[in-house]
UniProtKB/Swiss-Prot annotation:
The gene is atpE. CDD domains: ATP-synt_Fo_c_ATPH. This is ATP synthase subunit C, cyanelle. Pfam families: ATP-synt_C. F(1)F(0) ATP synthase produces ATP from ADP in the presence of a proton or sodium gradient. F-type ATPases consist of two structural domains, F(1) containing the extramembraneous catalytic core and F(0) containing the membrane proton channel, linked together by a central stalk and a peripheral stalk. During catalysis, ATP synthesis in the catalytic domain of F(1) is coupled via a rotary mechanism of the central stalk subunits to proton translocation. The keyword Transport applies. SUPFAM superfamilies: F1F0 ATP synthase subunit C. Belongs to the ATPase C chain family.
């Protein structure tokens, strides 16, 4: 494998994981904060808010996992070689 392609793949993998974690991390923090605020305002809808929050957190975390899959593909099954 060419050294330049190998180095570029490692950098791309690092960027894939890093950038894929930034958006969902910010979104999860915002969603959790808003959920706590909503539960504090209306404690009677605690179960509905918590269920919706957990489902949305799972969807956001899937984006990070997709970034990890792309990074692993770049590192171990390099399509550029």
């Amino acid at each position: 494998m060419d050294a330049t392609v190998s180095a570029a793949s490692v950098i791309a993998a690092a960027l894939a994981v890093g950038l894929a974690a930034i958006g969902p991390g910010i979104g999860q923090g915002t969603a959790a904060g808003q959920a706590v605020e909503g539960i504090a305002r209306q404690p009677e809808v605690d179960g509905k808010i918590r269920g919706t929050l957990l489902l949305s957190l799972a969807f956001m975390e899937a984006l990070t996992i997709y970034g990890l899959v792309v990074a692993l593909a770049l590192l171990f099954a390099n399509p550029f070689v």
